């Protein structure tokens, strides 16, 4: 469901903002430093309760403000009201959903599925496994209802086992309890991830073919421990080495997506431009699969697309966005860079940011 209204106050260099975006393509232009990326950042915080620019949201509060306050309304029957506030002197976020306080971040994410494509996202292939796990789990979360509970239980059990590993003397009974808990929920989490990947692989292959036909590229899911052994057996056998390290070395927290060309990692074979196209295909395929499996669309936040893709691939990428029929926010320094990227029948809402002020064109 698209965002139909946004109200931001106290966000970086942006003036108080009241935006009514279009349900489809929204092009936001402006000079570097004008506030375009801050606008995307505000939407990201609304859906994820965190910024993609800073680990501490208080750093996004305008210098002359005591808090950053973000409100959004997601279209629907009925519409859904989202709210996130972070005061400079507060230790935690205040999150609201339809006026209800104390809402979990998972409920925000469920109400507003977001896909971010920015320079950091384009480094997905060469970055840490944690980024690829987050990418994978975004997809599983939105199509598998059991995922969040399994993920939460795994994190809890893992925390307890790691704490026990760091004790001078291990309580064998407690260790056994938490290893059984960790193994049970990890096996479920692995099954959900595996099921999703079986569906995602085809969507990715089809999308990539139009962006960058590559022979021999394979996408594989690695679950984080020996596929021939149950996790409980692995945990029991690895206690001594885990204790030496002070943490659990195998399990779903070590899962990864591996892209290869032949026997080599794809990142070692592909040019920087090719890597960007592969990541573009990954992101587009997730939105496509979400629509196919649930009938819901995600909102794409795309920062400075003209700087990341050449003209030809930019046009193909934009045509994919049109086919997905989702809401898109794209920033660009120059309007002309994306003027011819769309089909004539596509409605494009135009906005301009100038010295922190949003103007409708």
Curated annotation (Swiss-Prot):
The keyword DNA damage applies. It is found in: Cytoplasm. Pfam families: SMC_N (PF02463). GO terms for cellular component: cytoplasm. The RecF protein is involved in DNA metabolism; it is required for DNA replication and normal SOS inducibility. RecF binds preferentially to single-stranded, linear DNA. It also seems to bind ATP. Keywords: ATP-binding, Cytoplasm, DNA damage, DNA repair, DNA replication, DNA-binding, Nucleotide-binding, SOS response. The gene is recF. NCBIfam families: recf. Transmembrane segments: none annotated. This is DNA replication and repair protein RecF. The keyword DNA damage applies. GO terms for biological process: DNA replication; DNA synthesis involved in DNA repair; double-strand break repair; SOS response. ATP binds at residues 30-37. Gene3D superfamilies: P-loop containing nucleotide triphosphate hydrolases, RecF/RecN/SMC, N-terminal domain. Belongs to the RecF family. Its main location: cytoplasm. GO terms for molecular function: ATP binding; single-stranded DNA binding.
């Amino acid at each position: 469901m698209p965002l139909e209204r946004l109200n931001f106050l106290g966000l970086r260099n942006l003036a108080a903002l009241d935006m009514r975006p279009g349900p489809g393509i929204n092009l936001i232009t402006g000079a570097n430093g004008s506030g375009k990326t801050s606008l995307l950042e505000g939407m990201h915080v609304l859906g994820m309760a965190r910024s993609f620019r800073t680990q501490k949201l208080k750093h996004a509060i305008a210098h002359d403000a005591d808090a950053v306050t973000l409100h959004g309304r997601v279209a629907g029957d009925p519409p859904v009201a989202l709210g996130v506030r972070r005061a400079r002197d507060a230790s935690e976020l205040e999150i609201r959903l339809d006026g209800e306080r104390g809402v979990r971040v998972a409920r925000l994410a469920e109400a507003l599925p977001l896909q971010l494509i920015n320079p950091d996202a384009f480094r997905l292939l060469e970055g840490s496994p944690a980024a690829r796990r987050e990418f994978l789990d975004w997809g599983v979360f939105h199509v598998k209802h059991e995922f969040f509970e399994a993920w939460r239980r795994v994190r809890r059990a893992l925390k307890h086992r790691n704490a026990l590993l760091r004790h001078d003397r291990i309580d064998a009974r407690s260790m056994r309890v938490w290893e059984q808990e960790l193994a049970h929920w990890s096996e479920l989490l692995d099954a959900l991830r595996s099921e999703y990947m079986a569906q995602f692989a085809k969507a990715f292959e089809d999308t990539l073919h139009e962006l960058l036909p590559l022979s021999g590229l394979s996408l594989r899911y690695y679950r984080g421990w020996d596929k021939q052994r149950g996790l409980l057996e692995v945990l029991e056998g690895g206690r001594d080495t885990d204790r030496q390290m002070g943490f659990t070395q195998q399990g779903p927290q070590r899962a990864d997506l591996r892209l290869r060309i032949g026997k080599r990692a794809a990142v070692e074979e592909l040019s920087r431009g090719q890597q960007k196209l592969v990541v573009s295909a990954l992101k587009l395929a997730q939105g496509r699969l979400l629509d196919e499996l649930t009938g819901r669309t995600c909102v794409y936040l795309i920062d400075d697309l003209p700087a990341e893709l050449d003209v030809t691939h930019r046009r193909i990428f934009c045509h994919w966005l049109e086919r997905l029929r989702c809401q898109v926010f794209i920033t660009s320094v120059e309007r002309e860079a994306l003027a011819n990227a769309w089909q004539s029948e596509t409605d494009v809402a135009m906005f301009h940011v100038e010295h922190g002020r949003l103007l409708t064109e």
